[in-house]
Amino acid sequence: MDIIQGLIQQPKIQSVDETIPTLCDRVENSTLISDRRSAVLGLKAFSRQYRESVIASGLKPLLNTLKRDYMDEDSVKAILETILILFIRGDGHDDLTRGWISQQSRLQNGKYPSPLVMKQEKEQVDQFSLWIADALTQSEDLIHLLVEFWEIDNFHIRLYTIQLLEAVMATRPLKARSALISLPTSISTMVSLLDDMHEPIRDEAILLLMAVVNDSPHVQKLVAFENIFERLFSIIEEEGGLRGSLVVNDCLSLINNILKYNTSNQTLFLETGNLPKLAHLLSEPISQDEVFFWNDQRIVNINTALDIVSLTVEPGNTVTTKHQNALLDSSVLMVVLRLAFFHNIPKKVRPVALLTAANMVRSNEHAQLEFSKIDVPYFDPSLPVNSTANGGPIKLIPVVSILINWMLYANSVHTFDTRVACSRLLKAYFMDNFDLQRDFLLKQVQLCNNSTNNVGDNAKENGGSNKSDKESDSDKDTDGKDGTEYEGSFKANLFEVLLNYDAELNLNPFKLFFTTDIFMFFFQQDHKYSEELREITRNVTTGNDLEDEEPLKAIQTISELLTTSLTAADIRIPISYLTFLIYWLFGDFKATNDFLSDKSVIKSLLSFSYQIQDEDVTIKCLVTMLLGVAYEFSSKESPFPRKEYFEFITKTLGKDNYASRIKQFKKDSYFSKVDMNEDSILTPELDETGLPKVYFSTYFIQLFNENIYRIRTALSHDPDEEPINKISFEEVEKLQRQCTKLKGEITSLQTETESTHENLTEKLIALTNEHKELDEKYQILNSSHSSLKENFSILETELKNVRDSLDEMTQLRDVLETKDKENQTALLEYKSTIHKQEDSIKTLEKGLETILSQKKKAEDGINKMGKDLFALSREMQAVEENCKNLQKEKDKSNVNHQKETKSLKEDIAAKITEIKAINENLEEMKIQCNNLSKEKEHISKELVEYKSRFQSHDNLVAKLTEKLKSLANNYKDMQAENESLIKAVEESKNESSIQLSNLQNKIDSMSQEKENFQIERGSIEKNIEQLKKTISDLEQTKEEIISKSDSSKDEYESQISLLKEKLETATTANDENVNKISELTKTREELEAELAAYKNLKNELETKLETSEKALKEVKENEEHLKEEKIQLEKEATETKQQLNSLRANLESLEKEHEDLAAQLKKYEEQIANKERQYNEEISQLNDEITSTQQENESIKKKNDELEGEVKAMKSTSEEQSNLKKSEIDALNLQIKELKKKNETNEASLLESIKSVESETVKIKELQDECNFKEKEVSELEDKLKASEDKNSKYLELQKESEKIKEELDAKTTELKIQLEKITNLSKAKEKSESELSRLKKTSSEERKNAEEQLEKLKNEIQIKNQAFEKERKLLNEGSSTITQEYSEKINTLEDELIRLQNENELKAKEIDNTRSELEKVSLSNDELLEEKQNTIKSLQDEILSYKDKITRNDEKLLSIERDNKRDLESLKEQLRAAQESKAKVEEGLKKLEEESSKEKAELEKSKEMMKKLESTIESNETELKSSMETIRKSDEKLEQSKKSAEEDIKNLQHEKSDLISRINESEKDIEELKSKLRIEAKSGSELETVKQELNNAQEKIRINAEENTVLKSKLEDIERELKDKQAEIKSNQEEKELLTSRLKELEQELDSTQQKAQKSEEERRAEVRKFQVEKSQLDEKAMLLETKYNDLVNKEQAWKRDEDTVKKTTDSQRQEIEKLAKELDNLKAENSKLKEANEDRSEIDDLMLLVTDLDEKNAKYRSKLKDLGVEISSDEEDDEEDDEEDEEEGQVA
């Protein structure tokens, strides 16, 4: 039976997870094709719903079967279809393969959509499709197999393979393309698919070719050579041309992809006869054969066709002109222009047509000429399409004028792209054609001047139309009424828009934008002829001579129009004016002069830039930029000179504000939102008004981005320096050419020098051989040389004596300088003592004035203070005795004081560093305080919430107990009255307890702050008491002091006048140092006080932190105090920021002044030498006067010491009396108010003292001016020294430059260090703040947890109480209905209050979140600041490296110059030596001649041989003379060359060189005379030859020869004498030269030393000035802070006193009320006890008493909680509680 049932049962249904693997297994492993095919079809069925599992387990089997069964068409079709489904299915639940017909925008090519179109619309590829693509492209065999499937005739297989390859190209384009290219026949077969008869295959092949060709130049070339253009144009014709569907667009876009970025394909396209086809295609909408109706697809088709045209003429290629000519010859340009100016063309097509025409015309003169000949019918492009078709007669107008008209007046949002295209076409028409630009501007100027002429004539003049007479006649015929109206409406002039005022410009603001854009195009600086075009526009004038108006130039009129349009409704109008002016003025000096000629415009622009309006940010920034550019390119000769203009701007604007405005323009204005892409202007965004967001021209954007650094740093340039224009690329090329020429010349010179060097070496070898011969003759000259040495030794001794005398003089000078310095230091010390004495006199005078005023007030209160005066008179005696004792102690204290002053001066520097560290700690503590205050606010808010909740619950309990008692007392009238009183008492108790707790908290906080102020108050009260006690003393001593002060005052005034007269004549170079040291000693005490205050503050903050962690009460108490401190700290921070900014400005001004002074120093250095003598005489006189002043100062010091002793004695007596009078302070509190008034008078005196300090600062400035004057004189004297030492001026200048660069390096390094320190401090502060935040967050979280636990406890208690109250309600329901109603109403009110409190809690939580967000913002801003400072550090480091490179270059230049000078000197010395050697050789030759003549006398028979020897020697001498002459000539040439180099390097050596040259010329003359004499000797040699011939004939001629020899001897002797004289002269010249060189070296050394000293002194002075400026600023800031703190302390004391009085009054009143209420309670309780005894209804009373006991227990709990919280409960209340408990016990017993 079981077997039968198993057979009968149905088989189990197999799941999908089981079937798919089985199918995959069948596909891979089954042997029969039919089984594999059926398995593939099964997978195909599952592929739509179970895509993931099919891909995971069936992709490899499918691909393997495809390779195996590629011959079976059915299986191939099934496999390809399944893979396509898996590709296209998509990730989501929707099947994209089936719902695609409704989604796609094109017709469906077969069963499945094209994957490329899906990718374009979906724009995402899922992971599974990538998996399939990787599997297909893993080996190239699969791609090759798919290409082979195209040869199969089956439609479905071919279509599915194309779609599969599209899918692979969509997912993995690079791999698929490389696999296709690897097969040689793949592209040809792909292109052959275009000829397929099936349209789906053709369309999908077009899409596949688009993907394969895109961005692949190799494939582009392969496709282009497959005759693809003819095939595509034939497909376009079959589809109907531009009227066709998406297939036409696909064909055109495929052509576009083939031609893109491929010039060879472009030339092939143009040369293979495709232009007529393209022209025919484009002319279809214009043809009159058929009416052309437009739709979206046709617009897309024509735009892609126009894109093909513009691709062939891309700008920048070498083939563009050729292509432009081809397009012009094939009439494509005319077709495109007809499209652009055809009235039926849609608005989306017209701008594209205009842009393509611009590309065809750009930079082609032939095309531009042909373009200018075209006339076009006018119509308005902003009107609808069919409105102008039937609108009357047609008026022909030149193309240029209609383009200008459309650009300016086609005012519609929809035609903005046509306006842009018109401007582009105009620019292309004028591009690289200067003649057209010039003629156009001249005609525009004529039209502007002749504005009364007809517009039609203007149009003809502008465009230059070349129409025949017939056409003009036809135009005249068409003119009529309509023609006149038309001419009046037509406008095409740029100057009218630019220079005429238009009230309706707000309606068409882009009219001005486009005009300025075209003028900027004309004014491009890269343009060669831009200057001439600028001149033409600059000379255009406006204004009528008839109306007596001055004609204004173009820039002046534009600037006036700018001032009128600054507040225009549309912001584009002033922006276009401002950008145009900035572009014009930049680099144009003439234009800046025209702009600066009208000062009223500049003033109005400056006033506008400082109007307080937030909306005009871009305009204000552009106005400041215009002013800065005008300054950058102004000059001394401009109508508003450069220096005056600089001062005028910086007074109101300032450098920092200017730079910040330009940064703001770049980051926070409309400029920051500009899209840098040039084509973005064609499709701009729209603003709120509907206009496009286009504000700036591309030319202005380019200029600003390229020259932002120069524009930003315009005001930082020196006004005394003339501006430099921008260096063009052409000038750089010229310099490079010159550099190459010079390099070639240098190489040629090097070759020449090498050749000359070789020649000279050969000559040197010959000369060395001769030198050996001449060494023997040198011994003869030693005798003469010894005599010269003796003379030289005598001269050396004389030189030594002179040098010794010079050294003595220099030593004397040094001694005098040291004495002068010592005298000056003494003078300064005396001056400082005088200033101190003057200050002490002033303080005494002020003290007298205050004493007199106090005396008057004291005399008024004598009647009241009579009794006190008797006691004070007794105390006066004790005070006088103490005064005597204190005078003795005073002398000791003076000695100790002098020692302390020395030690204090040493400690000042250390304390300054400590102050800096304390300031840094203070800043950190401020940050901590701010964070703590925020957290305290948060915690206090939570505390208030919790306490309010507790109070509300307490009030509920109290009210409910009152209700229960009122219900019990309703039974009896007596109990009702008593319980009403008890309610009032309990309410007052609760309120009083709450108020007491609040007041106690306030009192605690006040007491803590009072303790902080008691120290300061005690010091003030001590001073007040001292003043009180000194009044009586001073009244007695007043007359004596007045008499003494009058006499001393007269003496002091006389002495001061004498000292001032003497000090004015003396040098006051270092007065500032002494004065500032005295000021530092004065401020030392103030700084110590500040340190103490800061330490106290630090201790207070630490105590507050500890108390905040211990208990939450103290947080609330200190909250208000911390808020006040926070406000004060914020004020201090703002004040410090303002002071820092002012100090920075002062530093910049001081640096400028210092630079000016350094420039003036050079002028005054020449006068120092003359005035040094005068000063030396005056110093001797001043020394005598100083001795007298020293004696007088000593006497003054003694008097001051006596006065100080008296003051100290008075102070000590007052302190002793203060200890005695502490008991009388309470009685004298009334007099404190009067003394406060006196304090106010003292404050006024302090202000007067501050004014006196300011007057002293003025005096210090005057003394600084005198110092500067004398420094200038010193600089003049140094100039005189330099005048004698100008021989090495260039070397010194280079040294100065290097030193300047080093100084700048040092300054930059110091700035870097400061910034690094700031960054480190910021980082440290940030770390500290973060650690504190984390710590406070932890504490706050813990406190929150505690508070939440308390809340939960309270909630539980409230629930328990509510349950108890509900029980009581049930009991009370038996009572009256009125009581229940009241009870319910009160409960509702309480619930409303709870809701209100919850809302307040939510608001506070939001505030806490806001504070957290602000903290995060602050941290982010700190991070940004750190990043900015790090970037600035990097830039500074780069600048430092550049400066170091400059220094190394300058050092190398200096070394090269020194080497050149040394080489020149050595060459001169060598030349002189060679000349001397040649002369010595001549002398030796003459001596040989003498010896030979003597031998001839002895041996007449050997005369022939001797004559031969003489001839040989003469010839050798002649050759030697010739060589010497040549060497001398070469030396002369070298000397001239060396002269030129020396003149360039050292100009002042010319005089010495001229002397040397004159001497050399004399020596040359002597040499020439010697030559002439030698020639005579040569002639005598010829006579000797005649004698030889006649010797055999006659002996008489021998005698004649002997006589002639004697004559020669005499001549030779004369020559020898002359040679000796010349040698002596040469030696003397050499000695003089050596002396001069030694003198030069000494002068150079002295110059270097003086320069080093001057530089050191200047650096020291600068450092001292900077130190004193910093110290002065710090002291001023500290004085201001102390004054503010003093005022705050006074105000706080008054406020505290008021608060204390109010608190005392309230506490007293409350205590009185509590006592009254306690008494009433006692009475009521006594009455209650009596009533309870007398009451009969014992049962009800027992119930009520039980309720009362419960309530009393709850009250006891709440009191215990109040005690835990710190609220004190009076003893009376506790007694009442005990009494109540006793009464309750008695009641229970009863």
From Swiss-Prot:
Residue positions of the PTM Phosphoserine? S1770
Report whether Ribonucleoprotein shows up as a keyword of the record: no
Instruction: Name a GO CC annotation attached to this entry.
Output: ER to Golgi transport vesicle membrane
The role this protein plays is: Required for protein transport from the ER to the Golgi complex.
Region ranges (Globular head):
1-724
Q: Subcellular localization, per the record?
A: Cytoplasm, Cytoskeleton; Cytoplasmic vesicle membrane; Endoplasmic reticulum membrane; Golgi apparatus membrane
Source organism of the structure? Saccharomyces cerevisiae (strain ATCC 204508 / S288c) (Baker's yeast)
Q: What else is known?
A: Present with 2330 molecules/cell in log phase SD medium.
Q: Where is this region: Disordered?
A: 452-484, 1185-1221, 1326-1351, 1485-1547, 1645-1667, 1722-1742, 1762-1790
Region described as Charged (hyper-hydrophilic)? 465-487
Q: What gene, per UniProt, encodes this protein?
A: USO1
- Biased composition annotated in UniProt, kind: Basic and acidic residues: 467-484, 1194-1209, 1485-1512, 1519-1547, 1655-1667, 1722-1738
Complex and partners = Homodimer. Dimerizes by parallel association of the tails, resulting in an elongated structure with two globular head domains side by side, and a long rod-like tail structure.
PANTHER family per UniProt? GENERAL VESICULAR TRANSPORT FACTOR P115
Which residue ranges have biased composition labelled Acidic residues?
1770-1790
Instruction: Indicate the segments annotated as coiled coil, or none if absent.
Output: 725-1790
| UniProt repeat feature ARM, residue ranges | 45-89, 127-170, 173-213, 215-260, 261-312, 314-362, 363-429, 431-512, 543-584, 586-630
InterPro entries in the cross-refs: ARM-like (IPR011989), ARM-type_fold (IPR016024), Uso1_p115_C (IPR006955), Vesicle_P115 (IPR024095), Vesicle_Uso1_P115_head (IPR006953)
This chain belongs to the protein called: Intracellular protein transport protein USO1
Q: What is known of its domains?
A: Composed of a globular head region and a rod-like C-terminal coiled coil domain. The rodlike tail sequence is highly repetitive, composed of a heptapeptide repeat pattern characteristic of alpha-helical coiled coils. May form filamentous structures in the cell.
Q: How does it sit in the membrane?
A: Peripheral membrane protein
Q: Name one GO biological process term.
A: intracellular protein transport
Instruction: Give the record's keywords alphabetically.
Output: Coiled coil, Cytoplasm, Cytoplasmic vesicle, Cytoskeleton, Endoplasmic reticulum, Golgi apparatus, Membrane, Phosphoprotein, Protein transport, Repeat, Transport
* Region described as Dispensable for the protein function: 991-1790
Q: Which domain of life is it from?
A: Eukaryota
Family (UniProt):
Belongs to the VDP/USO1/EDE1 family.
